[in-house]
Amino acid sequence: MGGGLVEVDVQTGQDACESDLPMKPSRTLVLIGCSGNGKSATGNSILRSEAFKSKGQAAAVTKECELKSTKRPNGQIINVIDTPGLFSLFPSNESTIREILKCSHLAKEGIDAVLMVFSLRSRLTEEEKSVPFVLKTLFGDSIFDYLIVVFTNEDSLIDDNVTINEYLEGSPDFKEILAACNNRMVLFENRLRTSKRKKAKQVQKLLDLVEEVERKNNNKPFLFDLSHESMESEAVVDEKAKKIRAMKSNYTKQEMSNWKEEEVNSPLAKKVEKVIETTSLLEQKLNQEQNARLEAEKRANKLHEESSEEIKILKEKLERAQKELEKRDQGCIIL
């Protein structure tokens, strides 16, 4: 479990586009999302430092909850907690659940906002569609009052020449997730070549949404239910893992059913079916031609055998006739 305070230089860290934040001593943000969506990179953009290990790959980099902090120019402390990828919960992984629940220790004064991170570079997976259920299972219904959706890889929209609204029009599942958090969302571009000004703007927009969350919750942070002896107790973890396993089983069956239906009706499947049909017809035609050729060969062989027999008989008759003529010729000479 890592931790640390990253100081931001007042001269270079503050961008002209940023406004001073209300003087709340500190804010705590928690990053949640599937592996490879850019959670750690988003945390680094917020902290303005390479505080968390981050790699552009699907394999999980974050194995345990980590807390890193930065001091903003107005003196406010921003705490960012990075968590293991939710993807590792499927099939349910008790150790990952236990690790995520450690937020209760790292955020003892509560959480001001939960940042649910999705990547715009990839389609929404079945696991990601189940995120609302997983969050509800892990933290309870009230967690949605603190949820903000962060879309990473904003540059992919520019590459595809589409707006975020156009992108969401084709993603009804995203709309459902956004509806659960009152459509609070922000776009992030975490590339190294992204300008400091752009990064400052996106972080400021995020912090504006955090303020909105605070106002809606009367400045009360999300507090964990500590009625249990420990959030990571075996009983609590087992109960949550059981619910997630049951959910995953249902999703898997539905996913396989959808996949089979999609595959059967896909253009590729139809092409394959056409190829199989054509191949079958060709094989049938080849078999017919082969059978016809075999029949022709049989008839030719039979004719050859019959002709050979007739030639043999004719030859024998000629030989006998020749002998008869020779005998007659000899008889005539004696007389």
From Swiss-Prot:
GTP binds at residues 33-41, 54, 190. It comes from the Eukaryota. Residues 152-155 are annotated as: G4. GO terms for molecular function: GTP binding. Residues 189-191 are annotated as: G5. Pfam families: AIG1. Residues 82-85 are annotated as: G3. Residues 24-231 form the AIG1-type G domain. Ubiquitous. Residues 60-64 are annotated as: G2. Induction: Up-regulated by brassinolide, nematode infection and cold treatment. Down-regulated by aphid infection, 2-aminoethoxyvinylglycine (AVG), high CO(2), isoxaben, and propiconazole treatments. Keywords: Coiled coil, GTP-binding, Nucleotide-binding. Residues 33-40 are annotated as: G1. Signal peptide: none annotated. Residues 279-331 form a coiled coil. CDD domains: AIG1. Belongs to the TRAFAC class TrmE-Era-EngA-EngB-Septin-like GTPase superfamily. AIG1/Toc34/Toc159-like paraseptin GTPase family. IAN subfamily. PANTHER family: GTPASE, IMAP FAMILY MEMBER-RELATED, IMMUNE-ASSOCIATED NUCLEOTIDE-BINDING PROTEIN 11-RELATED. This is Immune-associated nucleotide-binding protein 11. It comes from Arabidopsis thaliana (Mouse-ear cress).
